Amino acid sequence: MQRRAFLAGGIALAATPAISGTLTVDGGTITIDLRGDPPPGFAMLAENWVRKSAAAVALYYGRFPVPELAVRLIVGQDGGVHGGQTFPGDVPAIRIRVGGRSDPADLLVKDWVMVHEMVHLAFPWLDLQHNWMAEGLAVYVESIARVQAGHIRPQQAWGDFVKMMPRGLPHDGDGGFEATLSHGRTYWGGAMFCLLADIRIRQYTDNRLGLQQALRGINAVRDFRRQWDFEETLAIGDRATGTHALRDQYMEMKDQPVTPDLDALWHGLGVMARDGGIAFDRNARLAAVREAIETPVS
């Protein structure tokens, strides 16, 4: 989750850290500050958590998205991860609330929040009108990046999409993405936009390129340190793939509500609900597209 009214948060971030350390991941230097009352051994667990998450994001984008990052962990007395925020600036900052009683599985296996917040770093800081893209992109890329890094199985990511993306469909009276700012439309509607764009790019390029290459092209010249024009940013992504996929889809969906047939989409991708889980049909029409989305790019 991004913060646009971040002055108060910036004041909180300036508090004296309890423990701090630095690590480097694929071109990025990350400072980790622990605040609160972290128990013995928690600093090492936190470092492993940040490093593993950063490596997944770097794998997806080809490098870590920004040269410097400050990670502030507010350590409480419980367990688990309780949400995060990403702040723009010359040195972007991520603030996450986490329980000091978290075990390695909580942070290294179950958590998705750290990767989600780091994905924000690879795209320009956007105004509220385009928050659906910022959050939807983080939802979508976080899932695919974790699959490509081997953190989760593809069945988990696609199962989440099948279960949650219907929340992103427009309701009666809704407008396009720029007019309806509900939680479901912002997070899961935005993620649906990204999946559809990924498929569209791959259809335009005979499955040679996808959204991942478009986003790498954007991150090569822009990132979360600055606010940039949204349509210009999409044009950069389109140039990276030699298509107009992002622009065309944005123009189709920004003002008018569009209701894709998700059941037909899953069928085409070969994603099938079976026995309480997800199975894949490798003979489906778009099965090769789904497999390409899941596969790391060199």
Regions found by a protein language model. Give the residues of each.
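Juxtacatalytic substrate-recognition/specificity segment
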Residues: 23-126, 130
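Beta/coil-rich, acidic/histidine-enriched accessory regions frequently appended to metallopeptidases
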Residues: 51, 224-298
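Structured segments of extracytoplasmic/periplasmic soluble domains
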Residues: 56-63, 121, 141-148, 196, ...
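Stable alpha-helical elements in mature extracytoplasmic
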Residues: 46-53, 110, 114, 134-137, ...
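Acidic/His/Gly-enriched intrinsically disordered linker/tail segments
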Residues: 129-198, 202-212, 216, 220-226
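N-terminal export signals
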Residues: 5-20
